[in-house]
């Protein structure tokens, strides 16, 4: 079944480029840039990936991102992910990047963007992988910081297909960023947002009504609100679900408890994605395979999930 799932044409719609930083590449970039890591070797770093919640993961994630310094670093990071896309027949990808993670430590916005966009262009021409880039704001930072990032990005507006909202969810509801998303919408940028992962269903309502998102990233806690589920079915607003991430971060205690197939069978437009695959132990095929292994996902369900991902694209092609 793994090989069949791997060959299935897929789109990936919930993927953080910084979350594809594999331990080997992290050490390579650390050596290249003279960055001291707190782990003596790759295996020690792999053992450090034993965290219990979103915040512990984010602490490790931001520490790892410190090795990314130059345009070439961001190119290499993105290119490594695109090679994995080719390996797993991801024909379309719409990755996030978090500019604040880099600009707050002195890396120029233009440096980050240039490396990523060149790799994505090379992915189109050399690998045939289509897609587009999503500019994502860190919700644990103030609204003013997100607005500054948006203003930095607007001169390069054509480099982006949407804006997003990610990072620590609890205590940072979407309504805090309503003005930022209004400004982005005025510039012609559609929106997506992380909601309903650790946060309550109310955050999903806010993302829909206040941020006017076209997709909900995660969204699995929508199942706690029947009226919300009915709205998602009626509007066919997609959920970009990340099964391995959800179990790794204890959104569900085990994969056997995951609700993605229940949502699929009810008519919610759910999709399968890998989120931060270097940290969660698997790329998109591994996520599909986990659903087969633990939930008995059938080939028909896999085809429908893959078709949903193609239908839910924001970028053409």
Swiss-Prot record:
Site residues (Important for catalytic activity), renumbered to this chain: 218
Q: Name one Pfam family in it.
A: A_deaminase
Q: What class of enzyme is it?
A: hydrolase
Chain residues that bind substrate: 276
Coiled-coil ranges per UniProt: none
What keywords does the record list, in alphabetical order?
Hydrolase, Metal-binding, Nucleotide metabolism, Zinc
**The EC number(s) this enzyme carries:** 3.5.4.2
Q: Which CDD domains match?
A: ADA
Note on how the cofactor is bound: Binds 1 zinc ion per subunit.
Q: Which Gene3D superfamilies match?
A: Metal-dependent hydrolases (3.20.20.140)
- Family matches, as InterPro entries: A_deaminase_dom, ADE, Ado/ade_deaminase, Metal_Hydrolase
Reaction catalysed by this chain? adenine + H2O + H(+) = hypoxanthine + NH4(+)
Does Metal-binding count among this protein's keywords?
A: yes
Q: Give GO MF terms, alphabetically.
A: adenine deaminase activity; zinc ion binding
Query: What cellular component terms from Gene Ontology apply here?
Result: cytosol
Q: What does this protein do?
A: Catalyzes the hydrolytic deamination of adenine to hypoxanthine. Plays an important role in the purine salvage pathway and in nitrogen catabolism.
Annotated protein name in UniProt: Adenine deaminase
What organism is the protein native to?
Bordetella parapertussis (strain 12822 / ATCC BAA-587 / NCTC 13253)
